[in-house]
A protein has these predicted regions:
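Peripheral, non-catalytic segments that deliver or gate enzyme domains
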Residues: 1-91, 95-107, 119-136, 176-180
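Flexible loop residues that form catalytic
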Residues: 41, 54, 116, 194, ...
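Hydrophobic residues at beta-strand termini and immediately following loops
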Residues: 62, 80-82, 114, 143, ...
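Conserved hydrophobic/aromatic "anchor" residues
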Residues: 82, 108, 138, 212, ...
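A fold-wide structural signal in alpha/beta-hydrolase
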Residues: 110, 132-144, 303
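The conserved beta1-alpha1 loop
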Residues: 114-116, 276
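Active-site-proximal cap/loop segments of hydrolase catalytic domains
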Residues: 143-337
Length: 337
């Protein structure tokens, strides 16, 4: 952390001693700067809000954000890093099932979870989806592949026109790192992601058919050409930038075909579960429809869950429950073989 003055530094360090293992954010402060509103969180809790008086050093809890969560039942999210095949340092997070650590975790079933965006990042903190998977016995690896934000301009620009190529290699290299460490059972690895992560799931199944025993694609892109043609109106001002960062549908057509999973379904050998919202404004439902149709024509096992009342990710509680129950059943079936 960087502080503007010694008083702020002393105050924050005093507060931090009361919350070992938690991140602390200041969400409000009075004009005299002696009364602060704090928000805490960790990898195992959404934390709480507190009011702190720096004059008499008193702390009062205002409210727990998620009082129903038992932190003792949650898993730790461990910061990790590995090297890509071309020498980039890739940071990420490994969440192990309860009771495991880096020393005793051996031959576990694994879910590789690339984030969406792709120009976003995974961060340390409570993630209910990751905790759900860890609770079901899976080790979960999240990685900030090239293009992820927060690592500088050079790392960001290293992703330009690298969808399905070096960006995908970063994900593959993370999977191989887990295998080499002995943490992953190489016969029980699935890949799951949403949006760009769904695209990375499909490309992972295409490029590494022997590495992944199953895949879950959640609102992912399958065809770079139709994806570009169906972007929402509010993205149209960015289309030229998309051509520069992802690829121009005319000038880079050969490359875009190479990295469009729908054209390489014949390379997929493992079962796939696809979930999609029919009213998705960002990734049109046709992206998933095309993929399912192509897989069925090739005789590749695929399950499809499409919801008419959903967009880019499920928001309705009943649909979310259905999706996670279906994914749990699918992973349990495919990774227990």
């Amino acid at each position: 952390r960087h502080y503007f003055d010694s008083t702020s530094k002393a105050t924050f360090e005093k507060i931090q001693k009361q919350f070992a293992g938690y991140e602390i954010g200041i969400t409000g402060v009075n004009k005299a700067e002696n009364i602060l509103i704090l928000r805490t969180y960790s990898d195992k809790s959404l934390g709480a809000y507190y009011i702190y008086n720096s004059e008499d050093d008193t702390m009062e809890k205002i409210v727990e954000v998620s009082p129903w969560i038992d932190e003792n039942e949650m898993s730790n999210q461990l910061p990790v890093d590995y090297q890509s095949r071309d020498g980039l340092k890739i940071n990420g997070y490994l969440t192990l099932p309860k009771g495991y650590n880096m020393e005793n975790a051996k031959n576990l079933p694994v879910v590789i979870n690339p984030h969406g965006g792709p120009w976003a990042r995974d961060s340390w903190g409570f993630n209910p989806e990751i905790q759900f998977l860890a609770n079901r016995g899976y080790a979960v690896l999240q990685m900030n592949f090239r293009g992820s934000t927060g690592y500088g301009r050079k790392f960001f620009e290293a992703s330009f026109k690298k969808w399905g190529r070096e960006m995908q290699d970063d994900i593959t290299d993370g999977t191989q790192w887990l295998i080499d460490k002995g943490i992953a059972d190489s016969t029980r690895i699935a890949i799951y992601g949403g949006s760009y992560g769904g695209y990375a799931t499909l490309m992972g199944m295409v490029k590494e058919p022997k590495m992944y025993a199953a895949g879950v694609d959640y609102v992912g892109v399958s065809n770079m050409f139709t994806f570009m043609k169906t972007i929402p109106p509010y993205w149209e001002p960015m289309l030229e930038m998309m051509y520069e960062m992802v690829g121009d549908v005319e000038k880079d057509s050969a490359m875009l075909r190479e990295v469009s999973p729908v054209f390489h379904v014949d390379k997929i050998k493992a079962p796939l579960f696809i979930a999609q919202g029919a009213n998705d404004p960002r990734v049109n439902v046709d992206e998933s429809d095309q993929m399912v149709k192509a897989m069925k024509e090739k005789g590749v096992e695929v399950e499809y869950l499409v919801k008419k009342d959903e967009g880019h990710g499920f928001r309705n509680e009943e649909n979310r429950f259905e999706f996670y129950r279906a994914m749990e059943k699918f992973l349990n079936l495919q990774l227990s073989k």
